[in-house]
């Protein structure tokens, strides 16, 4: 794809889309299947950069799998135990947090030296809270460049026991510990320090561990107990849910310029917290319909809101650009963890919203957006962040064209995004 893509004004946005698999679920499923006893057939696996980094890492660790030509079905021959390296090994994981954090914990159960590294931005994304927790359980972990950040060298040694972990920056640290804990020698008892962010992502982790045969004692998301000495059991077939975060752009498009858009692959029983993005659209005035395997949204007049968005941090970015089309200001609160994602999303979002004419107040953990009377044509910097590119595609639903720089960055989670988006666009 070219280095910039100009989207022309769209008159109407409507249709149906079947969602690609969830990134969060895909990488969890691959790691669980790799360590399980038996064969797991994964269906609707996401084909994206982040998932390819996980697949490449598992292959380097001796995991055997067969990937379909379309890369959405994968048959994994589980190891029936912990991942291990045959000799010293370095794994490059790009900017994939859903690979870096869980693999750091999983490989702390092994005996060989493994180095985990990635792109420059990955080396700016904190991992100290996870490393501190792993060390409490006996793991030997070295920082190779800057303390608290990748790259890290893992020497094994994690046995479980009493562990406390700070949950205030990223839920991925807790997810990593939970997924590794069943294979530790001892029972693992985890206590959460601070406010646990992105709690619905922990619900995903617990549900998936259950699907692979492991139960976790969950005491109000403040304390967790995991029995040691277990082996995950392959569920034979596992269907990866559609990506609820990806659904947000299409549902928002309908709320802004529908028509009606129906997204399939998720529904009222989805385990992903980001399905509640649709509830936020409803609070803003859109009409939403829920089915067992779909969510539909229809346009209505939108108004600004003031809400805590901690439970849906990724989908909340889409509310920031949807706010450009609402009457009155919108305030998104409790979103500090935007700052430690693929880029500092609070700063990036504030900067680009101002380009299209919005008045924006950027706080430490909040964003207040006042929409302009008329959106301005702009060239949007995407900061190598897939969600910035997809969020700002919605600007085209005004009477104004928008140019997206580096549109290919959507390959991280949704390589086909702009083709799918265009298929629902009815030009002016």
Curated annotation (Swiss-Prot):
The keyword Heme belongs to this UniProt entry's keyword annotation: no
Catalytically driven reaction(s): 3-phosphoshikimate + phosphoenolpyruvate = 5-O-(1-carboxyvinyl)-3-phosphoshikimate + phosphate
Pfam families: EPSP_synthase (PF00275)
EC number: 2.5.1.19
Active site: 314
Alphabetized UniProt keyword annotations: Amino-acid biosynthesis, Aromatic amino acid biosynthesis, Cytoplasm, Transferase
Gene Ontology MF terms: 3-phosphoshikimate 1-carboxyvinyltransferase activity
GO cellular component: cytoplasm
Catalytic class of the enzyme: transferase
Pathway terms, separated by semicolons: Metabolic intermediate biosynthesis; chorismate biosynthesis; chorismate from D-erythrose 4-phosphate and phosphoenolpyruvate: step 6/7
Cited Gene3D superfamilies: Enolpyruvate transferase domain
InterPro entries: Enolpyruvate_Tfrase_dom (IPR001986), Enolpyruvate_Tfrase_sf (IPR036968), EPSP_synthase (IPR006264), EPSP_synthase_CS (IPR023193), RNA3'P_cycl/enolpyr_Trfase_a/b (IPR013792)
Binding site for phosphoenolpyruvate: 23, 97, 125, 172, 345, 387, 412
Localization: Cytoplasm
Residues engaged in binding 3-phosphoshikimate: 23-24, 28, 170-172, 198, 314, 337, 341
Annotated PROSITE patterns: EPSP_SYNTHASE_1, EPSP_SYNTHASE_2
Subunit structure: Monomer.
Protein name from the UniProt record: 3-phosphoshikimate 1-carboxyvinyltransferase
UniProt organism field: Edwardsiella ictaluri (strain 93-146)
Gene name linked to the record: aroA
């Amino acid at each position: 794809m070219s280095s910039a893509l100009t989207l022309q004004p769209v008159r109407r946005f409507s249709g149906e889309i079947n969602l690609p698999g969830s990134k969060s679920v895909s990488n969890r499923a691959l790691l669980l299947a790799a360590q399980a006893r038996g064969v797991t057939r994964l269906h609707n696996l996401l084909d994206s950069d982040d998932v390819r980094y996980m697949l490449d890492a598992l292959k380097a660790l001796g995991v055997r799998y067969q990937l379909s030509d379309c890369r959405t079905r994968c048959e994994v021959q589980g190891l029936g135990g912990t991942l291990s390296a045959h000799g010293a090994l370095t794994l490059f994981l790009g900017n994939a947090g859903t690979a870096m954090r869980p693999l750091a914990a999983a490989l702390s159960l092994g005996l060989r030296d493994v180095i985990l590294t990635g792109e420059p931005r990955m080396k700016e994304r904190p991992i100290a809270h996870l490393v501190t927790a792993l060390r409490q359980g006996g793991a030997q972990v070295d920082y190779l460049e800057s303390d608290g950040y990748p790259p890290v060298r893992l020497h094994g040694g994690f046995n479980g026991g009493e562990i406390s972990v700070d949950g205030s920056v990223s839920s991925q640290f807790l997810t990593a510990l939970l997924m590794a804990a069943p294979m530790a020698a001892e029972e693992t008892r985890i206590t959460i320090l601070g406010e646990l962010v992105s709690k619905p992502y922990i619900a995903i982790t617990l549900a998936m561990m259950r699907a692979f045969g492991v139960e976790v004692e969950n005491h109000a998301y403040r304390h967790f107990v995991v029995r040691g000495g277990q082996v995950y059991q392959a569920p034979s077939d596992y269907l990866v849910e559609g990506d609820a975060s990806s659904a947000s752009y299409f549902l928002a498009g309908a709320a802004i310029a529908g028509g009606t858009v129906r997204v399939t692959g998720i529904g009222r029983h989805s385990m992903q917290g980001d399905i509640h993005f649709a509830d936020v659209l409803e609070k803003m005035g859109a009409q939403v319909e829920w089915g067992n395997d779909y969510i539909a949204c229809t346009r209505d007049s939108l108004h600004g809101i003031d809400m805590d968005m901690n439970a849906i941090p990724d989908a909340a970015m889409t509310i920031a650009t949807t706010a450009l089309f609402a009457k009155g200001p919108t305030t998104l609160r409790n979103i500090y963890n935007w700052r430690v994602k693929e880029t500092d999303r609070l700063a990036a979002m504030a900067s680009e919203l101002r380009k299209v004419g919005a008045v924006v107040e950027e706080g430490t953990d909040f964003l207040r957006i006042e929409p302009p009377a008329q959106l301005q044509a702009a060239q949007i910097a995407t900061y190598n962040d897939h969600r910035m590119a997809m969020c700002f595609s919605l600007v085209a639903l005004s009477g104004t064209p928008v140019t997206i720089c580096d549109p290919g960055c959507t390959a991280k989670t949704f390589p086909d995004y702009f083709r799918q988006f265009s298929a629902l666009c009815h030009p002016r």
